[in-house]
Amino acid sequence: MARRPEADAPPKKQAGPRINEEIRAAKVLLIDENGEKQGVMPLAAALDAAREASMDLVEVSAGQETPVVKILDYGKLRFEERKKKAAARKKQKSSELKEIKIRPNIDTHDYEVKARAIARFFEEGDKVKITLRFRGREMAHQHLGMELLEKVKKDFEETAKVELEPKLEGKQMTMVLAPR
């Protein structure tokens, strides 16, 4: 019968600062729960002060000869850190690149529908790549495609900026707009 590998593995070290008995220094610089510096003292005295306040002793700065420790509620600290990370993650919305495909001889109503879709993408904070595809003899009238992309650029000049100017790649013309 095979043994489970985690049975003989050492216990996992928790990430984050050392707290209470995990602190390894003999003398520490103590900062109390009010943020006032209490001075250098033995670790045992600092632990007693933390227990007296019914809080934890947390190692704030471990790099020095006498590490800086602070008396605070570690559970509350972790909760607030998690909350900050979640808020930062929520704020950091990644901008997607949405694509709108059109043809050079697009009808007015079809253009309006595409324009509404582009406006919605800008409201959501997404970039828009407009792809204008030419077929057959339409390649002879590339100026019509350029005029159409210029019209799109003019229609959205208040809400978007041109990130990539219109350019011809094979049988299609592309332009990228980003929200302002």
UniProtKB/Swiss-Prot annotation:
Keywords from the named record: Cytoplasm, Initiation factor, Protein biosynthesis
Pfam family, one: IF3_C
Keyword Repeat included in the entry's annotation: no
Superkingdom of the organism of origin: Bacteria
An example Gene Ontology CC term for this record: cytosol
Keyword Protein biosynthesis: yes
InterPro entries, A to Z: T_IF-3_C_sf (IPR036788), T_IF-3_N_sf (IPR036787), Translation_initiation_fac3_CS (IPR019813), Translation_initiation_fac_3 (IPR001288), Translation_initiation_fac_3_C (IPR019815), Translation_initiation_fac_3_N (IPR019814)
Subcellular location(s) per record: Cytoplasm
GO molecular function annotation: ribosome binding; translation initiation factor activity
GO process annotations (BP): ribosome disassembly
Subunit structure: Monomer.
Function: IF-3 binds to the 30S ribosomal subunit and shifts the equilibrium between 70S ribosomes and their 50S and 30S subunits in favor of the free subunits, thus enhancing the availability of 30S subunits on which protein synthesis initiation begins.
Record family assignment: Belongs to the IF-3 family.
NCBIfam families: infC
UniProt-recorded name of the protein: Translation initiation factor IF-3
